[in-house]
């Protein structure tokens, strides 16, 4: 069981690193089309977005926008945040799938 947890954690973090690399290497350095610029601006200025809101996204985007050296880098930082949060989602999805698969396949968890 200890060996399984070690391998599961290592593969999960490897999956995160691969996803983060792919997402961060393909981010849009500026504001793109549709809702993306609106979310970037509402995160940077903490203004009110359109009705769905996404307040957690805006608060975290505001945190990441403080790492920008100037205002022209805000879009890159918010898009980097989106890439890292998406990679984190893939990490937890991997761990969820392996947990459920192990639970379905094995009758006894000590195997």
Mark where each language-model region is:
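Membrane-interface starts of transmembrane alpha-helices
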Residues: 7-11, 70-81, 111
């Amino acid at each position: 069981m200890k060996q399984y947890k070690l391998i599961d954690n290592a593969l999960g973090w490897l999956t995160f690193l691969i996803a983060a690399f792919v997402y961060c290497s393909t981010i849009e350095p500026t504001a793109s089309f549709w809702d993306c610029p609106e979310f970037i601006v509402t995160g940077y200025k903490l203004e009110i977005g359109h009705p769905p809101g996404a307040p957690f996204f805006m608060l975290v985007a505001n945190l990441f926008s403080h790492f920008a050296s100037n205002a022209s880098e805000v879009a890159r930082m918010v898009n980097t945040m989106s890439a890292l949060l998406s990679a984190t989602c893939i990490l937890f999805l991997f761990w969820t799938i392996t947990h459920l698969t192990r639970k379905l396949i094995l009758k006894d968890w000590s195997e």
